[in-house]
Amino acid sequence: MLGWPPDGPTLRLDYRRFSYAGKFVMSNTGKAVVREADEATDREYDDAVLAAVAFNDDRTDPSALWLRYVTVRDDRRGEGLGPRLCRRVVAEATDRGYERTRIAVNNPFAYEALHRAGFGFTGETTGLAELVLERPVDRPAERDPGAYRAGLDRFRARDLSAAETEFLERKRDVDPPRE
C-alpha cells in the first residue's frame, strides 16, 4: 500500500507498458501496488511495479470505496495480479470502516478479472457506459450467473476487438468465475 487518498501518493508508470499510466501521477487517489521483489528503481518510471490500483472514497456514499483504475504491466497480464491486488485493497478497506467496494469497468477482460476478485455486476452503468461491479468488503459478492451473463451480453452489443469477441464467445453460457 503506497497510501490512502489523504496521503497524496503518486506513482510514475511507463505509459508504454501500463494502461492508464497517467492516472497514477495524480495525488487525489490512494494507491496500492504489486512490485517485483528486490527490484530497485531510480529511473524515470517505477520499473519494479507489476500492477497498480488507484482508489478513493465514494463522494455520495461514505460507506463505499471506489477502485478507480487497475493496471497490470503488459508482460504480466493474465497472471492474476490485478484480482489479487484488488482483494488486498478490499481487505484493507475493511479495517478503515468501509462496507462495500465498487468499480466501473469498460472491457470484458476487466469484467472477468474483477469477478475473480469477488465483485459482482450490479446491473448499473456509468455515464461512460462502464459496467458497475460491487462487493461487500467482508466477503465476496453473491455469485449470480444471470447477472454475470447479462454483463457479458452488454459487452457483446459493442464494437469490440477480435480478442474481446473471441473471449466473449468462450464465456457464452458459463457461470461466473470463483474468487
Positions of predicted regions on the chain:
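A conserved beta-strand-loop-helix scaffold within acyl/acetyltransferase catalytic domains
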Residues: D42-A64, V70
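A conserved beta-turn-beta hairpin within the catalytic core of GNAT-like acetyltransferases
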Residues: D57-R68, R77, R96-E99, G127-A129
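Conserved GNAT acetyl-CoA-binding A-motif
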Residues: A93-N106
